[in-house]
Amino acid sequence: MSNRVIIFDTTLRDGEQALAASLSVKEKLQIAMALERLGVDVMEVGFPVSSPGDFESVQTIARTIKNSRVCALSRALEKDIDAAAQALSVAEQFRIHTFISTSTIHVESKLKRSFEQVLEMAVGAVKYARRFTDDVEFSCEDAGRTPIDNLCRMVEAAIHAGARTINIPDTVGYTVPSEFGSIIQTLFNRVPNIDQAIISVHCHDDLGLSVANSITAVQHGARQIECTMNGIGERAGNCSLEEIAMILATRKNLLGFETGINAKEIHRTSNLVSQLCNMPIQSNKAIVGANAFTHSSGIHQDGMLKAQNTYEIMTPESIGLNRNNLNMTSRSGRHVIKHRMEEMGYSSQDYNLDALYEQFLHLADKKGQVFDYDLEALAFIEAQAAEDNFYQLRQLVVQSDSTEGVATATVRIEVGGEIKTEAATGNGPVDAAYNAIARATDRRIDIISYKLGAKGVGQDALGQVDITAVYHEQNFHGVGLATDVVEASARALVHVMNLTCRADKVADYKQNMHKNRELGGV
């Protein structure tokens, strides 16, 4: 048996079912092209009979994708299969995926038929789909709760009818790894023609076991895993593609399997799916979460600086990230501060490490994570000046025209002790406030990230706005808190303006430092 595991991505079919708003055809095509670069073997891109929009998107993707096999879903009905075949007919290579429920509860309660009738429908659907392509996949929906005798009969009949791939879904995420592995093993032991098809698995994450069940299934003979990027999908989601790919790559010494996934595309593809689907990735998500390669513990950071594999079982570069992050927090030791200063190009003669570390701990206790620009300000600006705010928001008044969508904001800002008042318009109240603040401070920055959240609960809750902005090719992170979202946004921007002001002071200091070095060397 081959050790190659086929990666069947269903982000654009099962994954999209979890979205509050449907993706456009253009957005689906963007994701499909990213999945092709990622190296998925098969991509299931829609359910053509469900709507004209889904039909169009399947057809568009089928016409464009060349290196992955494009697949469409259909129920065990001729009209569904006709729609799938028509939408896919423009593809260079395609698969029709047809399915029917096989568990007792589904057969009796949903389909209201006997198992024998369902078996006949399944065989008929596979034979009908074979008229359009020899690549037909058949799924036994809710296989995890199907009586094993019935499941064996269904699999044998579907293979005999012409199905090349048989999918065994844990549709409701009910099974545990030992149980699911036993189901797969029993199929291999009892289905006489099982060697004529690829056994696939499609596991949901209702109990958090989708990845574990999929890996166990492969160990018992399955050779296709159905999954989605970031694990998105119905209810608690699907098996995560990125987790499967990196488990099989990282533990190849133990498991002995390989895939065709280009792991260096994982990070980029994950971000694209997150952005287009408007589904943020939890920070502690395995492989692709913001904290996946971030180290905050001083002990861990010390180990990482000595040897990366002390606390990393895979490298961030392997999934397309530049490098790990050593978060500077109150738990970080002197060695991390010294390392960051060296990374920024400073020698130990440029600053006093002991004094810097003491100031760093004071700031870290107040704000949590400390960034590079904070460290530079502490090192080269007087301690109090490094924390003083040159800009302070004193008043914000916003007026909005609900019909035109144009808003006007007036701000009173204290600039180095002097009050300045400016007004500006914008596309909405937040944009207007930003424009007015930019005028008052005479600073221009590019905002590249805006996140709205809440701090506290009930009546005590405050709106929290986190922004990331670019100034002179450096990223700055600002936070604003207020009962009003517009005010919180304005305070976040003023926070960034103060950070850039300190950065300018640091730049002046560095320039003078370099001049003094040159003069000293003459």
Curated annotation (Swiss-Prot):
Subcellular localization(s) per the UniProt record: Cytoplasm
PROSITE patterns from the UniProt entry: AIPM_HOMOCIT_SYNTH_1 (PS00815), AIPM_HOMOCIT_SYNTH_2 (PS00816), PYR_CT (PS50991)
Primary subcellular site in the record, as a coarse category: cytoplasm
Domain Pyruvate carboxyltransferase span(s) in chain numbering: 5-267
UniProt xrefs under SUPFAM superfamilies: 2-isopropylmalate synthase LeuA, allosteric (dimerisation) domain, Aldolase
Listed Pfam families: HCS_D2 (PF22617), HMGL-like (PF00682), LeuA_dimer (PF08502)
SMART domains documented for this protein: LeuA_dimer (SM00917)
Residues involved in Mn(2+) binding: D14, H202, H204, N238
Known cofactor(s): Mn(2+)
Keywords on record: Amino-acid biosynthesis, Branched-chain amino acid biosynthesis, Cytoplasm, Leucine biosynthesis, Manganese, Metal-binding, Transferase
Region of interest (Regulatory domain), residue spans: 392-522
Keyword Oxidoreductase set for record: no
An example Gene Ontology molecular-function term: 2-isopropylmalate synthase activity
Enzyme category, top tier: transferase
An example Gene Ontology CC term for this record: cytosol
E.C. number(s) listed in UniProt: 2.3.3.13
Gene3D superfamilies: 1.10.238.260, 3.30.160.270, Aldolase class I
GO biological process: L-leucine biosynthetic process
Keyword Transferase part of the UniProt annotation: yes
Family annotation (NCBIfam families): leuA_bact, PRK00915.1-1, PRK00915.1-3
Biological role stated in the UniProt entry: Catalyzes the condensation of the acetyl group of acetyl-CoA with 3-methyl-2-oxobutanoate (2-ketoisovalerate) to form 3-carboxy-3-hydroxy-4-methylpentanoate (2-isopropylmalate).
Name this polypeptide is given: 2-isopropylmalate synthase
Organism field: Shewanella oneidensis (strain ATCC 700550 / JCM 31522 / CIP 106686 / LMG 19005 / NCIMB 14063 / MR-1)
Gene this protein is translated from: leuA
